[in-house]
UniProtKB/Swiss-Prot annotation:
Substrate binds at T41. The lineage of its organism: Bacteria, Bacillati, Bacillota, Bacilli, Bacillales. Keywords: ATP-binding, Biotin biosynthesis, Cytoplasm, Ligase, Magnesium, Metal-binding, Nucleotide-binding. This is ATP-dependent dethiobiotin synthetase BioD. Homodimer. It is an enzyme of class 6 (ligase). Pathway: Cofactor biosynthesis; biotin biosynthesis; biotin from 7,8-diaminononanoate: step 1/2. Mg(2+) binds at T16, D54, E115. The active site is at K37. Belongs to the dethiobiotin synthetase family.
Amino acid sequence: MQHFWVVGTDTDVGKTIVTTLLMCQLQRLGLEIIPFKPVQTGEIYDNLHSYYADTAMYEKYSLQVLNKEHMNGYSFKEAASPHFAAQLEGQQIDVENLLQRIQFLQESYDVVIAEGAGGLFVPLDVQQSITLLDVIVSSKLPVVLVTRTTLGTINHTLLTMEALQSRQIDVLGIVFNGDTGSMMEQDNIHTILQYHPLPYAIIPRLQDISELANINITHTTLFERLYGNDPRNN
């Protein structure tokens, strides 16, 4: 199997949903998977209990016991861009440390799914000289791109694809998240695939996050691309 990133055209496009879904689908095949969120922001307080939504979702739906120390690099309380959230706490994000963590995880698990934060160009330092995209390039790992199906997604997706391809980052496929089946959404999907005929999967709009457990994408060309890269299947 291949280690990879899950990245998005923007914040809140469904990267965590897709990361969790791919984690579960691959776990069902008997693979040892670790989802890794290099940087997460926005601590949530609930009845004297605090947590972060991304890693909490991994743990809730995982079919395997996850090592908490392996799931995250940095967590910051403020729900903001990583560089600003870190600044508020007087911290700096050590990119080399993140890359070393990713390398260690690759040597320890069948598949590492690294989930991005926000969009590709989100800055990681106050000088705004290092972005998430720089980390992806340095990691030398391919990506799965998550995008919306709604109005505006064509432009956002094509711009993101241009940024990835201009840096020779291998795009394994596209996940269209939140589909309601409207004619406009179907045309958006068709148009994007005309520009970039990649493996893909479509996830319907979820009325409740618990519906995630019922989604199956193992029949999609995207999943075939991911699992088909495993030499054990040949």
